[in-house]
């Protein structure tokens, strides 16, 4: 768990990829965008992942960006939107390149549970996974923070038995405290499979789902895989020196 309360906020993105451009898009975001954002906006890359298409819509990428609280996010919004085009003019070439790889996206602003580790803490702890479970919960209005506390006290011990580690727990901002996103690191594909196989037969898992149902109206889980420059794979932030590690198409 985090040693200090996490006061960051996060931008979460589901990105719809055009054709066979997922690898191109992931490199464009990590190597070509993140180093700029780190300097100009104090924004860190928490993660860029590809979704496992068997478990969700495809082709798709999930981005998660760490902002320096709402004050930092407000400053970033000013930097981006206080222009006639509603885009930073200095990034026009970057935007033009990005649109070759992705069609559209759906974003959320997330507020972390205070005990959720920042990306720098996760990297310092050596957290990684062969895959990750991304869970999206729709809750009774007003119960997001109660649900996160239930996850902390009851859910974590259940999933840890299968080797799953909770690395992100977030409530969605700008709505009625009715949505939560959880992110679990899973060391091996087999540990994911073992947990899924036990969903109806393991008494602790069955009880945990019963407890969740007291607050959750519905939820869905998909799997993610690190992009090559994802900090949870490399243990560091993407840098300009990474730009030559992958050749984008002309």
Question: Can you name each region flagged by the protein language model?
Answer:
Residues 1-8, 126-128:
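Extreme N-terminus of proteins, especially the signal/transit-peptide cleavage junction
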Residues 9-11, 59, 103, 131-133, ...:
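Residues that flank catalytic or metal-binding motifs in active/ligand-binding sites
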Residues 2-5, 23-47, 53-58, 66-109, ...:
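An amphipathic, aromatic/His-enriched active-site/gating alpha helix that lines ligand/cofactor pockets
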């Amino acid at each position: 768990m985090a040693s200090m309360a996490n006061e960051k906020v996060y931008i979460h993105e589901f990105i719809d990829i055009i054709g066979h451009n997922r690898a191109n898009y992931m490199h464009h975001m990590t190597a070509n965008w993140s180093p700029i954002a780190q300097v100009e906006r104090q924004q860190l890359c928490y993660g860029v992942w590809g979704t496992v298409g068997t478990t969700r819509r495809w082709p798709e990428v999930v981005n998660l960006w760490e902002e320096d609280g709402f004050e930092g996010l407000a400053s970033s919004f000013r930097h981006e939107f206080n222009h006639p085009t509603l885009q930073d003019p200095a990034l026009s070439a970057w935007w033009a390149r990005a649109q070759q790889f992705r069609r559209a996206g759906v974003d959320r602003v997330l507020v972390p549970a205070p005990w959720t580790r920042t990306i720098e803490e996760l990297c310092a702890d050596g957290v990684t996974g062969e895959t990750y479970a991304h869970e999206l919960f729709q809750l009774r209005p007003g119960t997001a923070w109660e649900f996160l506390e239930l996850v902390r006290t009851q859910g974590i011990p259940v999933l840890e038995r299968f080797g799953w580690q909770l690395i992100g727990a977030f409530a969605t901002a700008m709505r009625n405290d009715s949505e939560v996103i959880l992110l679990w690191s899973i060391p091996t594909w087999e540990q994911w499979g073992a947990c899924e196989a036990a969903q109806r037969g393991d008494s602790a898992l069955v009880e945990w789902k019963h407890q969740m149902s007291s607050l959750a109206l519905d939820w869905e889980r998909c799997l993610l895989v690190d992009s090559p420059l994802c900090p949870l794979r490399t243990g560091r932030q993407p840098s300009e020196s990474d730009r030559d590690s992958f050749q984008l198409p002309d």
